Regions:
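Residue-level detector of flexible, active-site-proximal loop/helix-junction positions
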Residues: 17, 32, 99
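Cap/insert and terminal regions of metallo-dependent hydrolase folds
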Residues: 35-114
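Active-site glycine- and acidic-residue-rich loops that bind
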Residues: 24-36
Length: 114
């Protein structure tokens, strides 16, 4: 990372930024102060890779924060941001839920398709 930074190939994002066309990162906070989610423009709409902003589907769907977090109000704001950015709840991908492998179409061992 140090070399990439000196080569000006590393970009720190504190907010929102398009990484490549159709893929953006958005700071949401909550779980950690710098927690980010990723949005991906897809044929089905905008998907949100929630990472630790929603560890499990239940966190997002029922607005139940994960038990380890930095900022509780920030976690609820993150849920709101996820809901606003995703085209539908079906396009929200939590960070650690094994149900992802059941809810989405499997295309390989541990690989799913939106």
């Amino acid at each position: 990372l140090i070399r990439l930074n000196y080569d000006r190939r590393l970009v720190f994002v504190d907010g929102a930024r398009e990484v490549v066309p159709g893929v953006s990162v958005q700071k949401v906070g909550g779980h950690t102060a710098g927690m980010q989610i990723v949005t991906v423009e897809h044929a089905k709409g905008r998907a949100v890779v929630a990472s630790d902003a929603s560890h499990y589907y239940r966190n997002f769907e029922e607005r139940i924060p994960f038990n380890t977090l930095h900022d509780l109000p920030g976690m609820y704001r993150a849920f709101d941001t996820i809901r606003e950015l995703a085209s539908s709840a079906e396009l929200v991908i939590p960070g650690h839920d094994p149900l992802v492998l059941e809810r989405l179409k499997k295309v390989g061992n541990g690989i799913v398709e939106l």
